[in-house]
Amino acid sequence: MKFGQRRKDVKAYLKRNKNDAADAEAICEAVRRPTMRFVQIKSAEQQGQLMQHRTRDVLIRQRTQIINALRAHLAELGIVAAQGDAGVSELRAIVADDRDERLPIDARASVIVLAAQLEALQTLIGSIEKRIKMQHRSNEASQRVETIPGIGVLGASAITATAADPTVFRSGRDFAAWIGLVPRQDSTGGKQKLGPISKQGDRYLRRILVVGAIAVLRRARENPGKYPWLTQLLARRPFKVVAVALANKMARTAWALMAHGGIYRAPELAEAA
């Protein structure tokens, strides 16, 4: 298993000007420190799996840009549709209808290009998601992580590809801290001071976990009796704070399933067993 060092950790040992010799000296000095932390180097297979997620993320951002441009151009002509997929489908139908006289010839020629690009992006996103699902079905650890509420196929696939060897973390707390789902510390003089979450880690994983936690919280609001812990937290803490707390718990649970095996069991089922 190969490990590397973070540039940020080596920087503290660099003396004055930066050059190859000074860099090598700093690396040699840093690697001998007993408290130095190392980064596990991802395999080519892991990198390929994560490229699927990154590419999908880029295409989704491009799709959002195209939709916003299409809505803005048509709104200039007084054509407005509802939010969501239904509204986008309505706008695409208007663009495709040659008999609709609300669109001038030049305007139609422009928005047809946007509509065609939007359709192409939808096809590409679908093909990538299909491949991610195939990888997920062939990965036993990913299927176990998916059993956690709020972590779907995308989340499980991304977590297991990013942290293929969970034993590099001492505990689920370390894993959650590595993702950046713990408070940032600014403590001194024996006085503990905690701030917002550190956000030091994989932004993609953190976003997937928080979005999944928000989905679970919405279900908890609709069915409070099924989620007593979340209901109590929501009664005394802001919604987004609870979402991050739940995302932290989801990350720790995912680490436990990857490190020790098994599938997720709801607290009441675990107590009954």
Per-range role (PLM):
Residues 1-273:
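A detector of single, family-specific signature residues
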